From Swiss-Prot:
It comes from the Bacteria. It holds the Pfam family Ribosomal_S9. This is Small ribosomal subunit protein uS9. GO terms for biological process: translation. SUPFAM superfamilies: Ribosomal protein S5 domain 2-like. The keyword Ribosomal protein applies. NCBIfam families: PRK00132.1. GO terms for molecular function: RNA binding; structural constituent of ribosome. Belongs to the universal ribosomal protein uS9 family. Keywords: Ribonucleoprotein, Ribosomal protein.
């Protein structure tokens, strides 16, 4: 807890989100913009709001987020992870509910590196018999 803000760090792919929550009226600000202006896809907005809807805290908190790296989906996942951790910092009794939904666990899948002699990570060069 920093002042009257509860804090959580979320990560997904190469995105990192620093999330601060405090009691308020439900405003979510991402990198200085309202959430609807920052995320263009409806699915990204749904992903971010999942932990709040699950715990029935949709309009209970004002949320301030700084997110860097990655694309839109990775950033949305990082924000969700950060909100989950901040909610657990606020109230530890929410952990079993959030854990059961799979929001506490960090999604460890990362981009596989490109290998030498391949076009992409696994796509080989076309084989020619002759």
């Amino acid at each position: 807890m920093i002042g009257n803000w509860n804090y959580g760090t979320g990560r997904r792919k190469s995105a990192v989100a620093r999330v601060f929550i405090k009691a308020g009226k439900g405003d979510i600000v991402v990198n200085g913009k309202p959430i609807a202006d920052y995320f263009s896809r409806e699915t990204s907005l749904m992903i971010v709001r999942q932990p709040l809807e699950l715990t029935n805290h949709g309009v209970t908190f004002d949320i301030k987020v700084n997110v860097t790296g990655g694309g839109e989906t990775g950033q949305a996942g990082a924000v969700r992870h950060g909100i989950t951790r901040a909610l657990m910092d606020y109230d530890a009794t929410l952990k079993p509910e959030l854990s059961k939904a799979g929001f506490v666990t960090r999604d460890a899948r990362e981009v596989e590196r490109k290998k030498v002699g391949f076009h992409k990570a696994r796509r080989r060069k076309q084989f020619s018999k002759r």
